[in-house]
Every structure is written in C-alpha cells, then in structure tokens.
Amino acid sequence: MSDRIPALQMYTVRELAERDMLGTLAQVAGMGYRAVEFAGYGGIGLGRLRSTLDEVGLRAIGAHVPLWHWMERGDQVLEELHTLGCSYAVAPSPPDDVRMDEQGAWDIAKMLNGCGERCRAAGLRFAYHNHADEFASAGKSSLWEVMMERTDPELVEFELDLYWAEYAGVDAAELLDRHPGRVPLVHVKDMAAGPGKEDRPVGDGTLPWDRLLHAAARAGTTGYIVEQDDAVDPLRDSATSLKNLQRMLQ
C-alpha cells in the first residue's frame, strides 16, 4: 500500500491556521505531510496560498466546499479550486435546510449529481463527506446508501469518514467492500475506548486499522486524510497520526 497518499485536513489545525495559515502550512510540511485538504483559506489570497504550497512541498488534494456555495458562487468555486491545484471538490455535509430522512437523501443526491456534473465539465472530481447522521435508517438501508445508489458514479464519489461510520455502529470495512471504486478518499482518526468515543490520533485508539486499510486498498482508495475534530494538541496529534499512518500503509 506504499502508493497511498497521506494528507492532512486543515480543519484539524484550524485555530492555528486562522492566525497564520502560511506558517501553519510550513509546519505541516515539516512533519512530513506532502498533501493537504482545505476547509477554508484563512483569508489569504489564493495565488499567495498556492505559491506557499509550492514552496513548502505540499499539494492540495482537495477542499471542502459547502453545497450552498455551488448555488450562490459556483463559477468562483471552480476558479478557486483550479488556482490551488485541487483534484477534488468535497461537500462536507448536507445543507442545513434538508431533512435527514429518505426524501432528504434523494434531494441531496440530486444536488450532488448537479455539482458533480459541473466539476466534471471543469476537469475536477467531486465527492461527499459523511458524519454519523448519514447512517440513520432509510427503509431497509441507510441515508448514506440511498445517496450512494441515487448518485451517478461517473459524477459523484465519496469521502468516507471511517471514524464517523464506526461511531454510528457501521462496519466501515464492509461498506468499502460493497462499493469498490466509489470511495477514492477516506478520513482517518482513531476512537477512544469508553462511552464517549472521543477522537484520537490514528493508532492511539480502538479502530481496526489493519482491516480498514486493507478494505480501503481493495476499494481503490488513494487519499488517506487525517482529520481530528477535537485534537488535544493539533500539531502533535497530526504528527502522531502521520507517523502511525505511514507505518500502517507500508
């Protein structure tokens, strides 16, 4: 699995990045990361941001772009992604005004197909990122499965957050095995033991990484993106995750 790409979702270090995006990118590169995924740009001009990526040896694997941005400023979104050299645009969550039920999943799937069509026409790939809510029941399936079934595989891919799937009681490895070719990206963080199931650096928790990473490899996943929502020490935890992830992917 040595050809897999570890990356850092910059949301993990968001407070540092809000104060000093460019300096934080340099620190991320100094840990050994070679790719990042953005969740906002820290108010920095995108040309300058791209120059910094090039200078420190990082590439933007993608960026999280809320679905409403496509409705209000889609052309600008595409221009931003191209400037940064992103491969993927990722919808990070459903719109706030869509109910998380089966009809809502159909509505989201329709939006995703539309965004995916715009991205494909612009030479980009489009994916959807989950949390736990997408694994609520929808008939005999889950909302995530409904979105998977109702989206065009030529237009829409998925960024499966392994932690949130497992948090919801879903076997994430089995999900990957059921959907080969649809999940090019995964988000990785670990889960603490106990009822709180707090997130932890990769390798410092209870998730079955050998099983998960082999399932991801079988599914054709190439991007392994560290994202810790509530890191105790964001830089230290990001470095720990990278060290452990690199060892696991060898």
What are these regions (language model features)?
Residues E37-D54:
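Glycine-rich, proline-tolerant flexible connector loops at the mouths of alpha/beta enzymes
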Residues A26, A35, G42, L67-F158, ...:
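Active-site acidic/histidine proton-transfer and metal-coordination neighborhood
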Residues A7-R19, A63-M71, V98-G104, P201:
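Active-site mouth loops of central-metabolism enzymes
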Residues S51-R59, V65-P66:
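Active-site surface patch of divalent metal-dependent phosphodiester/phosphate bond hydrolases
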Residues A7-Y11, E37-A39, I61-P66, V90-P92, ...:
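A cross-family glycoside hydrolase active-site/sugar-binding cleft signature
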Residues M1-G30, H82-G85, S141-L160, W164-Q250:
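Histidine-acidic metal/acid-base catalytic patches
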Residues Y33, L58, L124, T221:
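Short phosphate-binding/catalytic loops that engage adenosine nucleotides
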Residues R48-T52, Q76-V77, D171-R178:
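A short acidic, amphipathic alpha-helical/loop segment
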